[in-house]
């Protein structure tokens, strides 16, 4: 069960995808508004929610995200957002028999970045990146930055600069993420940032992605054709 697409669905009942261990992608229309519990229990390969809705449209995405604490990518028409994993803990204060609820991971805060009407609050989402840099891995931060830069709906100049600065400081992780995802748009974006491509080209060849290697080799050939009068 690689992909499920239900355009007319309004309600997802409890345990709708229970034990769908091969489920990787769920595609829904804009009208989903009711969600039961335990929707994706044991769906350990789930990677993507695709909502066929405008990037600024009110949707049920916030509730849908609440059903998944693992890493998840969201695709809207014109936007792509990556939400990192978060964990919840109940710690018992033994003498008082009180349980303290704690949450670990910036992914929880990012899942709260919505307007009162139910649309994604892109400014709030982008503002969470600085805190995410404290605790998230290079790979996850590169996924987040690449998604926002490749489809920059609602992306402000300051946030764009922050994402580009992070990718520039972590070229190896950025290229590896783009290559592992076979994401040619992300690869071209990184090339456009003038990042060194030699190691990325070697990795492309190693994993057998010829289209990506062509993008990187094209950059290298163009670079060799440039010169100034000092070369004469």
Question: Each predicted region: which residue ranges?
Answer:
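Repeat-mediated protein-protein interaction surfaces in helical alpha-solenoids
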Residues: 148-163
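Structural signature of tandem-repeat unit edges
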Residues: 1-11, 21-34, 44-60, 69-146, ...
């Amino acid at each position: 069960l690689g992909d499920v697409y239900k355009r007319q669905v309004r309600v997802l009942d409890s345990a709708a995808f229970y034990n769908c261990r091969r489920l990787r992608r769920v595609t829904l229309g804009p009208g989903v508004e009711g969600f039961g519990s335990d929707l994706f229990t044991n769906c350990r390969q789930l990677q993507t929610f695709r909502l066929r809705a405008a990037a600024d449209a009110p949707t049920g995405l916030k509730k849908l995200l609440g059903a998944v604490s693992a890493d998840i990518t969201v695709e809207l028409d014109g936007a792509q957002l990556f939400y990192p994993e978060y964990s919840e803990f109940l710690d018992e204060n033994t003498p008082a028999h009180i349980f303290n609820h704690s949450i670990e991971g910036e992914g929880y805060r990012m899942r709260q970045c919505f307007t009162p009407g139910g649309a994604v609050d892109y400014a709030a989402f982008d503002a969470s990146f600085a805190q995410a840099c404290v605790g998230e891995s290079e790979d996850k931060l590169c996924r987040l930055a690449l998604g926002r830069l490749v489809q920059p709906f609602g992306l402000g100049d300051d946030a764009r600069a922050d994402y580009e600065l992070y990718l520039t400081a972590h070229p190896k992780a950025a290229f590896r993420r783009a290559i592992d995802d076979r994401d040619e748009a992300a690869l071209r974006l990184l090339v456009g940032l003038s990042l060194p491509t030699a190691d990325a080209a070697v990795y492309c060849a190693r994993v057998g992605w010829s289209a990506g290697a062509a993008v990187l080799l094209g950059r290298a050939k163009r670079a060799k054709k440039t010169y100034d009068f000092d070369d004469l």
